[in-house]
Structures are given as structure tokens and as C-alpha cells.
Amino acid sequence: MAYTIGVDFGTLSGRAVLVHVQTGEELAAAVKEYRHAVIDTVLPKTGQKLPRDWALQHPADYLEVLETTIPSLLEQTGVDPKDIIGIGIDFTACTILPIDSSGQPLCMLPEYEEEPHSYVKLWKHHAAQKHADRLNQIAEEEGEAFLQRYGGKISSEWMIPKVMQIAEEAPHIYEAADRIIEAADWIVYQLCGSLKRSNCTAGYKAMWSEKAGYPSDDFFEKLNPSMKTITKDKLSGSIHSVGEKAGSLTEKMAKLTGLLPGTAVAVANVDAHVSVPAVGITEPGKMLMIMGTSTCHVLLGEEVHIVPGMCGVVDNGILPGYAGYEAGQSCVGDHFDWFVKTCVPPAYQEEAKEKNIGVHELLSEKANHQAPGESGLLALDWWNGNRSTLVDADLTGMLLGMTLLTKPEEIYRALVEATAYGTRMIIETFKESGVPIEELFAAGGIAEKNPFVMQIYADVTNMDIKISGSPQAPALGSAIFGALAAGKEKGGYDDIKKAAANMGKLKDITYTPNAENAAVYEKLYAEYKELVHYFGKENHVMKRLKTIKNLQFSSAAKKN
């Protein structure tokens, strides 16, 4: 019997699964919440206040995930570690950290623990927007070809704007860093003791391509003179394709996890992209939505097309032999959680408690009794900026049509609908750019738990939606890549299509559009597009308001 382990490092926790290599059966799962969660107000040790739009993490939390979840899998199943042939990991991205020459994160060194820029910058760290704006302006002026691969704009969430922020605001941290690395690649570095960067993280998040490499030293010098040789000084390390073996588990990490030294370790992956084989997708025309705090949209293509506002397209970035496309929405589950935590009245909290259900479930039940358009509400889903297709973290959310009779469930439904409209806009943009999308798949917590949301997505997109058979698709995907890293000789696979066919899975559930609802959503979506054009491109009132807010925040901070 052969097994692999997949570990998925999410926004708030890490989860691991132990999977049977031949059948894809998930024998056990284990979850570890991050002790420091998201650090977005104060630094953990010093209490130092952080500016707005910051989102940091502590890398020690990631090691705790490995230390607790993997032994838990072994304990739950009784599987002999000698039968575990490989391990794969995936991570949120772009999530980066500066490290020293031994691989130690700078924030874990006493001399840097009071330095905010020494910590992990989480994917939703949006404080680098002005640096992204500058990068995009220079790239446009210089006619840099790489911009087209990223839909015409580099997001503030990606690596280089975040590094620019470090270089400008904390040059001593930039200089002290031996390397700046994706958290995904850092975990693999810890597991096997050698630094091998992933073509997935480098391609989608760091402006690297298999054919052209990184942009030139001259370009980086224009961003910041200290960054001229960044690719040699800070981004060094060989780049390897997903599906390859990065190395073997070290003695130290074997002791930490309970696995055997020499266990195959896969090249790191990104949480969205790794989920593709977990739902059995191995060919173009099928878009997968990974729906959680945010949503990532990924799909395969026969060739590279330029798609406005996409996050990126990378040859062999998702599966070998295909162009892998990515788009996304910065705020989906976070969107709904914000409303539940800040806007739901006590009476609804009490009703949910009496019914022994969560507030999300209560609101979904109530909202499900409404017809599309019945509330007269329309929202823009930009509570955390817009990733695709406008690529602007400085845009903010909006709700239109409220009256004194508006109810919480109506607002909740409008927020859900707004995220569905955003997904439809992404789908249409791909299609208009020559990338076919014939089938829609969904994975993640929302797809797993909320039929109300998924039916709205089916109605808004007017497409059937198939659902992942695993509640932890990224972890299953990582386990599949762990089987590839081990190879057929060790009981794994040499072919991703065979691995996906045997280990990937779907539920027997398909959400089918309601024709009557879809007709109403055609009208509502047309109005949504008008709002997107006006507030996203014509009137910059959202940005002006944000500027005033930040000035007032800075002024208040100085007084305190």
C-alpha cells in the first residue's frame, strides 16, 4: 500500500490529508490554526501599531502546522511511515518573507523582531499599492513585454511591489535579507534542505517566465537603484516545474513530522493551481473556482492569449504541456464574514442561536426566499480591492438601492450576487480574449458548505457548476503532486493525467441554472457592469475617499 500527504497552508490555518495513492481515498485529515493568525493591527511581541492595509504572518506558525498535523495523521490511521512515499505542499500566494543565508526568517532573529518588514507579507497585504502603480507606470513607459502576461497590470499583491516597499521603507531589512522567498518555497526549503523555487510561484507572482526569465537589471534599477541586481542577490535559486521532485525529507524534518528521512518532497505549489487535478481537470476549457476568503479562477489553455486584467498566464504553470491561466477576486468569504461580524443585529444572532445554526446559514435561509432583484439592491464586491479585471487594491466596496425597509438578508444576498457578477465578468473577459470556457467547477469551503451561494453563481453565470469531491481540494492536489514526486517506481505516478484520474474526485452534485432567475440576472448584471465602468474607470471618488481616510489615520496616529 502506498500513501502520500498533502499540506495546504491557507490564510488562517494549515490542513493536511493522508491519501491512498491508487484510489484517492482520504484516510484522515488534520487542521492547525495559526497561533498568530493574520497580524494586521500590532506586532505580536512589541505591540507596535501597523499602518492600514498591512497583513503579516509569523513563519513559526507554518512549522507548527507540520509539527502537529502530520503526526496526527499517523496517529489517526496507524499507517506505517515507510508506506508514505511522498509529500506535497501548497500555499497562499503571493505570500513572501525575507530570510538569512541559513534560511532563517529575519523576523525570528532577535535583532529584527521589532521590524514589521521582517515578517511574512501575506497575500492580502495591500500596502504596496503605490509601488505597484509606479512599477506599472515604468513598465508601460518602457514598453516591457512582461506586462501582457499579467493582463496589463502587476497587482500590489504580487512579489515585486512588496519587495519595492521593503527596499524603500526598510532598506536595512532589504540589505540584511540573503533572499526574499515565497512562503511555499520556504516550506519546501525547510523540508528537504535545498532551495528550489517553483515555476508556479515565480511565474504567476514574480514576473518570471520560462522563455524570458526575469525582467532586466535596468528595469529593476528604475524601480529602485538598490534593486538593480535583485534577481541575482535576492531571488537566486534554481526554478523547477510543479510535478517535479524538489528533494528528500531531511533527518531534522523527519524527526519533526514522524515521517522517514528520504521521503520524496514535491516542488511547491499555489493553493488554487494545485486544486486543478484534485477535481480531475487535465484539459482546457474547464475553469475551476477555489472559493474561500477570496476566489481564484484557474484554467488550462492550448496556447497563450492576452487577457485584460488576468493575474497571469504561465507555460506549464499548472500542468505540464499547457498554458495555465489565473484570475481572481480579492474578497469573497471575507466579504460575507465582514457583514456577519459587523452588520447583523442582535435579534438575528439570537435567532441563529435558538435554531442551533450559524448566522451565515440563517441569512442564507432567509435570503433564499427572495427572488433575484426583489430587494432593489446592487453591490460592488470590492471590499478588499479588485484583483480581476481592474487590478486595483485602492478600489472599495459599494451598496446601492437601500431604503428604510432593507433587511439584513437582502444585503447579504446582494453581496453574494456581487461576487457572482465579478466571476461572470472574469469568465466573459477570458472568452472575449479567445480562451474557451465550456465547464465550470468549484472547490473550497463555500462550494462545500453553501448551496444558496452556489445556486446564485449558477444562475448569474448561466452555467452548470460541478463541485469538488474533496472538502480540502488543495491538500488533495498537493498529495497528488507528492505522488508525482515519488514516481511510478516508488508506487506513485509519472503522468499527471493518470494521477488525476485515479486520485481526483467530484461530488454527485451539479448546480444547474434556473432559467427564470438567469433572465433577471441578465438585467442586473448589465447594471453591475455600468457601476464597474463608472466607479472603476471614470470616477475616482473611492480613491479620493481612501486618501482622505489614510491622511486622517496618519494624523491621529501621530497625535497618539
UniProtKB/Swiss-Prot annotation:
UniProt pathway annotation: Carbohydrate degradation; L-arabinose degradation via L-ribulose; D-xylulose 5-phosphate from L-arabinose (bacterial route): step 2/3
Entries under InterPro entries matching the protein: ATPase_NBD, Carb_kinase_FGGY, Carb_kinase_FGGY_CS, FGGY_C, FGGY_N, Ribulokinase
A biological process from GO: L-arabinose catabolic process to xylulose 5-phosphate
One of the record's GO molecular function terms: ribulokinase activity
Catalysed reactions listed for this entry: D-ribulose + ATP = D-ribulose 5-phosphate + ADP + H(+); L-ribulose + ATP = L-ribulose 5-phosphate + ADP + H(+)
Transmembrane segments: none
EC number: 2.7.1.16
Family statement drawn from the similarity comment of this UniProt entry: Belongs to the ribulokinase family.
Name by which UniProt lists this protein: Ribulokinase
Protein encoded by which gene: araB
